Structure formats: C-alpha cells, structure tokens
Design a protein with these regions (language model features):
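Short beta-strand segments
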Residues: 32-34, 60, 94, 120-123, ...
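A glycine- and small-aliphatic-rich helix-loop capping segment at beta-alpha/alpha-beta transitions
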Residues: 41, 45-53, 79, 134-143
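A glycine-rich beta-strand to alpha-helix segment
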Residues: 29-33, 38, 109-136
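Ligand-binding beta-strand-loop-alpha-helix segment within the catalytic cores
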Residues: 53-120
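N-terminal glycine-/serine-/threonine-rich phosphate-binding loop
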Residues: 1-31, 100
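Glycine-rich N-terminal segment of FAD-binding domains in flavoprotein oxidoreductases
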Residues: 24-48
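ATP/nucleoside-binding phosphotransfer catalytic cores, i.e., glycine-rich phosphate-binding loops
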Residues: 175, 179-231
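Class I SAM-dependent methyltransferase SAM-binding "motif I" and its flanking Rossmann-like core
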Residues: 130-174
Length: 231
C-alpha cells in the first residue's frame, strides 16, 4: 500500500488529483464512496473540483437500516452537496429496507454495471471501513451489519437518544471492496493513529477490517501527521 502523509490540505489535493486521473482514464467509471468516517473536506473538495462526473456512476457504500436510512441524518444525506455540484450519470444506494436475503442484490447491481473502478473510504478509529465493524469477515459482500455500541454512541446525537439510534446498517463488504480496481483510504486525526498503524503494519485480521486492504494491489492511504504518528 502506498502511504501519503502531509497536511490535510495537501493530502486532499493529492487524493483529488488521483480521482481526476481515474475519471480522465475512464469517464464512465463506477465509484463507491463511504461517507462514514470520511472527512467531510474530501467530499467538499470533490464538489469544488473541476472533475466531470457526468458519465460516472456513484455507488453509496453504506446506509442505516430502516427509517434512519431515509431521513435527514441518513448517510446518503452527506452526498447531497457533491451530487448537487457534480451530477453523476447514475447514483445508487443500498436499500435501507433490504433484509439479509436481499442485501447482496446490491453486489449484483455493482457487477451488472461492470464492477467498481474506484472505492473511497474513511478509516474508522477501530480500523473499520464503511459499516464493516471489527470482526467483519473477509469474504462478505453487501450485508446487514450490527452497529457496534461505540458506533451508535458516536452518532446518537443525530437521532436524539441512543434508544432512537439505528442498530444496523447495510454495507458493501470487504469482498466487494477488494474487488475494486483501486482503493483510496483516508484517515485524519490522532483518533486514527492506532488504526492506521494496525492497517499498515499489522497482519490482515478481522478485528481490523481495514487491514484486509493489504491484500489488494492498488491501495493508497492518505493520512495527516496526527494519524501517521504511530507508523
């Protein structure tokens, strides 16, 4: 995995350049983005860029299950500024009402579109990516994931109380992510330092889902100085 360390401004600029290059090579690219743990500045930079996404297809990487996945605090709401500024040829999102049996239909849609060309992920402080929480299996495709209590506590303010906070999410799995041609992983802040170290220097293991990215041949990891402090 290639690691890029610098100021947040510099690494976002480099990431944006990589996205621009991918779209220049293949304007009709299929791109999966997880807004979970992805610094909002990344989406802002893409929205403000001169990249043309009008021939590309966006696949939202994860969403809360049930009504939480349809309201103002749905994960998909984070994409509104990007899709307003940069219309895509098509935008797809996991069905928040899908059950376990039908969750993998999302993978079928991805494959029907020709597979993923690019995946952009945020690094969670426990090494999770999208809603692939610690313990996520290497072979999982899109699936219903139980959200860890610490995850629910982190988002509880959006939903009023912990009791009202979603308990499950639907997410593309590690298998789906590793099927992409290129992966960009972003981690900012000291809270990501331990996870970044485990992801880059540890062995691939289920308790650090991001560590499975070591098995891919084209991954770039973007860190600020605080996130890279334990490397």
């Amino acid at each position: 995995m290639k690691t890029i360390v610098g100021t947040q401004t510099d690494v976002i600029k480099e990431l944006t350049a990589q996205v621009a290059d991918a779209l220049a090579r293949k304007p009709e690219a299929n791109i999966a983005i997880s807004a979970v743990d992805l610094p909002v500045e990344v989406l802002d930079a893409l929205a403000a860029s001169d990249i043309a996404f009008d021939k590309a297809t966006l696949f939202q990487a994860c969403e809360y299950c049930g009504e939480a996945g349809k309201g103002a605090h749905a994960v998909g709401a984070a994409f509104s500024p990007l899709t307003a500024a940069k219309p895509f040829a098509a935008v797809h999102a996991p069905d928040p009402d899908a059950d376990a049996e039908h969750a993998a239909d999302y993978d079928a849609a991805i494959q029907a579109a020709g597979g993923l060309d690019l995946v952009i992920l945020g690094l969670g402080e426990r090494g999770h990516v999208a809603f692939n929480e610690p313990g996520a299996g290497f072979g999982e495709k899109t699936h219903i994931a139980k959200l860890a209590e610490v995850t629910r506590e982190a988002i509880a303010a959006d939903f009023g109380t912990l009791a009202q906070t979603p308990e499950q999410g639907i997410t593309i799995g590690i298998h789906t992510i590793l099927g992409a041609k290129k992966i960009l992983l972003v981690g900012f802040g000291a809270r990501c330092a331990k996870a970044a170290s485990a992801t880059l220097t540890g062995r691939p293991e289920t308790f650090i889902p991001a560590s499975f990215l070591q098995l891919h041949t084209d991954v770039e990891v973007y860190l600020d100085a605080d996130a890279a402090a334990q490397l």
